[in-house]
Structures are given as structure tokens and as C-alpha cells.
Amino acid sequence: MTRNINRDIVTQEDVAKYAGVSRAIVSYVLNNGPRNVSEQTRNRVLNAIQVLGYRPNQHAQRLKLAASAAENSIGIIAGGKGSNLLERPYYSAIVANLFDRAHELNQQIRFFSFFENLTDPVFFNKNIHREEISSLILLHPSMMLSEPAHDQILRQMIERIDNIICLEQSIYNLPALVLDLSAAAEMAVSHLIELGHEHIGFLALSDDRIAGYKRALTLHGLPFREEYMCVLDGTAMLSSAYEMTIALIEQQPQLTALFAANDEAAIAAIAALHDRGLSVPDDIAITAIDNTETAAIIRPALTTVNVPRREMVEYAFQFLLSQRVHPVASPASIMLPIELIVRESSGAPRR
């Protein structure tokens, strides 16, 4: 006898009983697999569904859809302060490349956030969850270690999401696409020394670039002079680099070259030197690190160490997608290749 569908919720068990099949067979018909069902049996199940008025469990379907969506969903978390980071052409280009590549690969960027937002428990529990994302990309993660209280947040994040890739540096032994800033700085400074410069100022950031600057001097038998180095304010890059360039050339008139921590600082330095009536590279040669798009179109064009941003993004997605299919317990980090791009600002012939 047909049950009263206005009184009771019809289940898959009811359909199976009416059709004279197992519940598994009903599931195969509803989901088109994974096992094949004969045409005769399929018709009996479909007839039972029609007679009983069966409707799939919407809640279960939503959970299934959510799980499927989460599998292809990625979160991006950036260290540092939001507005300051995205004002930097280097980082804004990386973020844009991440979104573009995700779209090409049919991956969904579920959220892009700054680490400071994770200190809000509501935000953390809503987003750092396997029902929301399967993978995480950590951009500029060294800035996430600025406060002791962040340690617990990071460890909870690692416990919840097991497919994580860091961009630039590794933290907590997580796999990373590592940018060797020390080697990049050594490359840029050595280029100036090989061109005959011995008095090289440094517009610095408080990171591994300082070690690379010092190592280049040591390798070429030159002393490190503290007075030749100014540490930039990373929250006001352009104005800080402009002002410190003027201070350096006024206080150290013997300088014949400058190494800037990044392209932004170098561009500000070129402007400052121009405003003081000095020519680049005739009076002061300049090198930097990043090779942003602006480096090639300013005049003089900037000699700078190329950071392979597009390759970094490509490697990141290759890693995350590979880990989903063939997870490796302790995946190795990858050192990103760097290359000096020689242009007019260093005064060297083009290569």
C-alpha cells in the first residue's frame, strides 16, 4: 500500500522497500553510480520515487556540495598590514596572479585576508575550516611571527588545514617557495663592485638583504660601513627611501652607488637624486631587487634582480593540487631562481 506522503517524510529506505531492492541500489540510481544498475531495476526505483513522492535530503545534499566546493577552495593569508602590503607593486602583482591562475585552474579563492584578522575567533572559526577550504597559501609569512600570541593561532591553523604552501619564506617547517634575499642582495651589490664602485650606500630593510650586502663587500675585500646603510620604514616605502637617499648623499658625498632593497625604493632614490641635480648612473649608479613592471619603463631603466613572481604562483598551485591527489608527508621546499637584469641605472652595458 502506498504511504501517505503528506504525513511522513519519504526516505531512501522506503523507496528501496517499495522497489524491492537494497538501499545501496537506490543510492546508485540517484547518484548515477558508482555501480551500474540494470535498466529494469532502475525503472523500478524511479517508479517507486514517483509513487512515493521521494525528495532527496536537502541538508545532506548541501553538505555534499559544500564538501565538494571546499575541495577546490583555497584561502590566501598575507602577513603584514593590509593597506601597506597591497600598496606595494610587488605584492599586489602576486595577489593578482594568484587570482588569475586560480580561475584558469577552476579553483576558487574562498577568501583573501590578512593575518591580523585571524586574531578574531569568529573569523578564524568561520574560514579556517575543512568545510570551507582544503588548502592555504601563506604570503609573506615571516610577518606573521611578529607577536608571541600569534604562535597559537598559527599552530591551530596548521592543525586544521594540512595542505599549506608558504611564499617567500618557510615558517614552522611548512613547505615553501623560498626567495633567497641574501643571495639576491649579494648579486646586486657584486654587480656594482665589479663595475668599480667601492662606496656603495644601502637603502635597507631589516631582513636577509643586509647579510647579502655585507657578504658581497667581504668577498670583494671591502669594509662594511654602518654609516652607508639606512633602514627604510616599510610602512612608508617611497617617502622613506626619498628622504634617506637625500640624507645619505648629503652625509656621505663619497658614495658613487646605491643598492636599494626593492624597486620602489630605487625609483624613489632616482627621483631624489634628480631633485638634487645628480644623474643616474653618471653620478650615482643604482641596483635593486624585484624587477616589477615599472623597472623596465622608468628612465633610466632599472638594473634589478628578477624575482620570478609568475613562476612562484605556478609552483604554488602545482604543489597544492599535487598534494590533494598524492600527499607527501614532509614535502621539500623549493628555492626560487633569481637573475640579475642589467639595464641603464647601473651604468653597465646591456647584456
Locate predicted features:
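N-terminal pre-catalytic "stem/leader" segment of glycosyltransferase-like enzymes
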Residues: E87-I94, Q108
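Short beta-strand segments enriched in small/hydrophobic residues
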Residues: I25-S27, K64-L86, H191, H199-L203
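Short, flexible/disordered intra-domain loops and linkers
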Residues: G82-Y90, L118, S142-D151
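Bacterial carbohydrate/catabolite-sensing allosteric modules
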Residues: T2-I5, K17-Y18, Q50-V51, Q58, ...
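N-terminal helix-turn-helix DNA-binding module of bacterial transcription factors
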Residues: M1-A66
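Extracytoplasmic small-molecule ligand-binding "clamshell" domains
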Residues: F111, E116-L118
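A short, flexible beta-alpha/helix-coil linker loop
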Residues: V29-G33, G79-N84, S170-N173
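The feature primarily captures lumenal catalytic ectodomains
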Residues: L138-L139
